[in-house]
């Protein structure tokens, strides 16, 4: 079995990412003797830092954030964009990986709901967010829909139940609808928000990827992008809320159009690691790309010793201004 030396850098381990136990490592371990070390031949990196610039080896980028890969810095990438770039790119949404994979698998073959399940719902709609830096449309919709009925807000942002919830899905399950708005709207960018709303047995009210209908059946949720205004979205939600038969029909519509396993990830990684090492490089080695990396490495020092701290203070002040809970 071929031995490969890899390392993960610039990932946000605070969000539950496990360096030695994740879909990437598990996929590679099927075919290779994987060593995670500090002198790698290959690195996997994400958007939470610039440490990847220290490694002049094969670079494989992954993002769970709304960020298009820079193919001048990476040899290969996995992300949200619906694009084709030879063997250098794989579209791999966040909800198919890490701790979110369980919710995705849960809704692939979920049992049908009945009217008794609908009758158990004790709340109208939920809103679970701690990020107050998203596009304003999310907060605006919360306020507009709240004029119709109370929305249970269980995150740190706009919390109205006395504190953040410990179990998000259990909290969501009590309500009929979930406000599943991404931080921003961008073609291809869809995260765990819609998947967790389905997994909790609710009807998502979704905003984010204008092309979401390519991945999920719009008969199973309210797609904000299908309506001319937020007022029209609210009218549709009211219609569903007042028609239990229609609501149950939406609950029982299979949400995922083309359920996917990890075989595409396996094939993508095998193509990279089965090659001779020197032939696996893809990124340009021009004077321009080299100069840009030098510039970013200099910026990295400013980020490490200055900008990181000023941004933290600024963001804390914004959270306080917007009423976001800073602790449980």
Q: What are the functions of these language-model segments?
A:
Residues 2-61, 67-152, 161-180, 187-328:
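Pol beta-like nucleotidyltransferase catalytic core
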């Amino acid at each position: 079995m071929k031995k490969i030396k890899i390392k993960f850098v610039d990932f946000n381990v605070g969000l539950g990412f496990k360096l030695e136990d994740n879909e990437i490592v598990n996929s590679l371990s099927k075919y290779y003797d994987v060593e995670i070390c500090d002198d790698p031949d290959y690195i996997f990196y994400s958007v939470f830092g610039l440490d990847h610039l220290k490694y002049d080896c094969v670079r494989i980028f992954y993002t769970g954030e709304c960020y298009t890969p820079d193919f001048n810095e990476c040899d290969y990438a996995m992300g949200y964009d619906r694009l084709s770039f030879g063997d250098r790119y794989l579209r791999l949404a966040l909800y198919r990986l890490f701790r979110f994979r369980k919710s995705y698998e849960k809704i692939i073959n979920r049992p049908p709901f009945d009217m008794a399940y609908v009758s158990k719902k004790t709340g109208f709609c939920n809103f679970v967010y701690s990020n107050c830096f998203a596009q304003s449309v999310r907060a605006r919709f919360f306020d507009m829909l709240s004029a119709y009925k109370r929305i249970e807000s269980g995150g740190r942002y706009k919390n109205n139940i006395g504190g953040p919830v410990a179990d998000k899905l259990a909290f969501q399950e009590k309500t009929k609808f979930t406000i599943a708005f991404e931080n921003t709207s961008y073609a291809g960018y869809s995260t765990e928000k819609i998947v967790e709303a389905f997994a909790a047995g609710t009807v998502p009210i979704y905003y984010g990827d204008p092309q979401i209908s390519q991945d999920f059946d719009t008969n199973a949720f309210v797609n904000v992008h299908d309506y001319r205004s937020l007022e029209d979205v609210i009218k549709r939600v009211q219609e569903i809320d007042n028609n239990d038969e229609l609501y149950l029909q939406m609950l029982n519509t299979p949400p995922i159009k083309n359920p996917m396993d990890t075989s595409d990830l396996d094939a993508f990684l095998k193509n990279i690691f089965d090659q001779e090492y020197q032939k696996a490089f893809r990124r340009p080695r021009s004077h321009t790309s080299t100069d840009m990396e030098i510039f970013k490495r200099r910026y990295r020092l400013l980020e490490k010793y200055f900008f990181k701290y000023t941004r933290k203070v600024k963001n804390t002040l914004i959270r306080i201004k917007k009423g976001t809970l800073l602790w449980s």
